[in-house]
Every structure is written in structure tokens, then in C-alpha cells.
Amino acid sequence: MTIRKQHHWLTLLAVLMTIGLVVNSANTATAQTKKKPNIVLIWGDDVGWNNPSAYNRGMMGYKTPNIDRIAREGALFTDWYGQQSCTAGRAALITGQSPFRTGLLKVGLPGAKEGLSIKDPTLAGLLKNHGYMTGQYGKNHLGDRDEHLPTNHGFDEFFGNLYHLNAEEEPENEDYPKDPEFKKKYGPRGVIKSFADGRIEDTGPLTKKRMETVDEEVNAGALDFMDRAVKADKPFFLWWNSTRMHINTHLKKDSKGKTGLGVYADGMVEHDGHVGEVLDKIDELGITENTIVMYSSDNGAECFTWPDGGSTPFRNEKNSNWEGGYRVPCVIRWPGVIEPGSIHNGIFSHEDILPTILAAAGDPDVKEKLMKGYNVNGRDCKVHLDGYNLLPYFKGEVDESPRKEFFYWTDDGNLANLRYGRWKLVFMEQRAHGFDVWQEPFVTLRLPKLFCLRTDPFERADHEAIGYGKWRFERIYLLVPAQAYVSKHLATYKEFPPRQKPGSFALDQVLEKLQEAGTSGR
């Protein structure tokens, strides 16, 4: 063979090899696209709407580049609703049901009997039907007992704490009873490691000192979970729940003074660094294009604990009926589905995540199935989902969010407000501020207050606008449509009633039990 012919054949071989590599690469990309998406839900705790710099635009003097990256590569939502407190917000997301329906409205305390029922399926359990590995890392706050642990509700594994941080550190209070029996009965459990096969390990108390680095422990476990899922070639669902930024913030030495703006800003920067570690791991594993990433928080900002407290431009704060108690930051990256850099102003809520994710996993009719009765990870379940499937909207198949309304339930189980479209009607209002919102009762109004959340998103008109009374009076016609929304929603509780009564910080339930016991004894 001549040198020229040899060169010709070598060139042809190189071309064929290149074509083969391109075809093989295309096939690999197609296979990756066809895989069920991985889901990573990253949650802060009590992080205010205004705390990520994607929302505050740097006006708070620090940056959260990793949370901002999710917004830049995905979408930012201005009107995303959590709930009024920790337990309710987490229950809404993981069950897709109104927390009034699950009875998980009141903040869970050590020793409390209320918790997530096995009759209420979770996003994790439903994804097990589709072959997912499921892991929850970080704060749970959906019940104190073993039966309430995530690993009894669809998660393969769990590592985290069960309550808010200030409850975890109560045993270190100088007046805390020294009697071991008191702590055993009423004290917080430690940081729990559990598995779906029934193994449960208490890894020790979440002390003030451990709080400095517990999120690092949690993050290490979460990264390892993703590693193992990818090696097993299985789609995975990771719910990563930070302890930041709930009070009380205890920072390690390296995190203190980072911003020069105090403990909350320093904590947010540390927290954002943990978010960055998760995003970097997703990149390292080569699964970025097939992984949905959401960042959000459970409830509105807790402002009364400032300077160790969140920030929101909205009225009032956590545990009130006002927007400040319910609006949360939310950014979602979903390659190939959500347009990068987009901003969405429609109404959305945590309840919508479950049906949306299930649709992405190949189960768009899960809501209808569950209403008729559906086997979820080996359990027969029949429930009413209150969330909406957002996938057609995210794909651009419809122009608006399917959610047109949002119901604001108080932690006592009362319907305080309704939002439909741009209108918000207030049936009960919290007139207290600061810590007193946890103490003072809501005031029931004979005629609802009215707000337009487009022209008055911060609900200032009723106490600042000279013409508010006339404006409100001229729009009484909005009341009957609001009643129709409420009637339709409440009608669903006839077939699917609340699972349990929400807990109580007062004596009403104790007195009720005594009355029931007295009646039954007659």
C-alpha cells in the first residue's frame, strides 16, 4: 500500500471513528434524557423572603451566590406560599395536602402526640412506586415518635433532628429540671439516624455546640446519599433540610464575622455555602441536566428575634395571617423545562410540588388515583391532594399557573384568609406583633377586609390609605365569589376530613378530653 493510500484509509478510519463517537454521545445523551429526573429539594428554616440576595438584590449587604445560581439557571417565584409555621410548611410539601387536612398545623414539640399519619402518603412513598432511592437529611419536624420518622413514610434513610433549634437546647437552660424522668418524657430526642428496615439510632443530643456544625454532618450524609444513588444507577429524591436560619443561631468560629453584619448574615452566608456543596456535587456526578433542584423555606420570616431573625417586606411575620407569615423565597432549576432566568408572578404553593414531581416521574394522574384509592409503596391510601400539577405550565403548554387560589389556615385550624387571583379577603386578623402573635387570639371580622395584592402587596392600605374604606365598600361584589371558592374547598372535607386535630399550646384540648371522659362515664 502506498503512503498516499495509507493516508487515505487512516483519514477515512478517523472520520468513521468520529462519527461513531458522535452517535454514541448522542445515544448517551438520549438515554440520560429518558431517565426519570433526580429531585433535590433544599430547604432553609425560617429563611425570609428577603434574605437570599436573588430577592434582596444585595441591599442587605451580603451575597448568597449559590442560591442565586439556582435562580439564574432556573426560575424565581415572587408569589410562592409556604405556611404559617415549620410543621405546617413541611407537611404541605411532603404530602401535597393542606395541613388542615393532615392536622399538622401546630409547631411540633418534644413529647407531643401529633405527627404524620401512615394513612397520608408522601412524595417519597409515591416516588418509591417509580423506583426511586429516597433520603431525607436534616430537620424533620413532623412528629416526635418513631411512627412519625421519615423512614416510616417512604424514605429509605434519614439523618437529622426532629424539632426547632431553641427546643433542642432547652435541656441546657439553667432552670431545666434535673430529674432524668422529666427529660425522658418531655425532653427532645437527639439527632436520629434511621432506615426503612426499622433500624433507629440516636446519635446524641443536638447541643448548642453541636449546632455549630450539625449542618455539615447533614450535608456530608446528603452528598454520600447522592453518590450511592448514582453508583446504583437509580433515580433519587433527596430532601435536604438545613437548621439554618431558625433561632438560636450558633456559629462555628470560621463563620463568625464573615459579613460584619451580625449573626444572621453570617449564618446565611454559611448556609449558602452548604447549598453550593450540594450543587457542586450534582455537577461532579454529571447529573446536572437530569436533576430538578428547588430551594425554599417552610414559612415566612420570624422577625421578632431580630437581629437573629429573618427579613421580609411583607406585613407581619411567621404565625400571623398576613403575607409576611406565608410568603417564602422559592427558586427552581429544571433543565429543559424551566426557562433559565425567568421570573414567575403567579400563585404557587408547597402543596403543588408533589403532583408536579410525580408528573415528571411519569405519574400525571396521581391526584385522581389517590382520590379513588391507590397503593403507595405497599400501603393502600385514599386521600385528596390539594396541590396542582405545574408541569404543563413550566413546559409552556399553558399560559398561567393552574393555582388560582390559596387558603390561609391558622395553626389553631381556622381559615383566616383567602386569596383568589389578585384579591385577598381577611376573615380573621392577627392584630398583635412580635412574640405576641404566638399569644394573642385572632380577631374574627363580621365583614372581611379586602386587599389587592398587586397594587398593595404589603397590605398597608387598611391602616395608611385615606380612601381605603370607600375603596373596600365599592368592591363588596368580590365577597360572593370568595364564598364560592371557600365552599368548594370545604366541601372536599366531607369525604376527606381532617386526619387529626392540630395540637394546642393552651388547655383547650386538655379540658375537652376531661369533658369527653366525664360524658362517657355517665
Predicted regions and their residues:
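Formylglycine-dependent sulfatase
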Residues: 2-4, 10-448, 453, 457-522
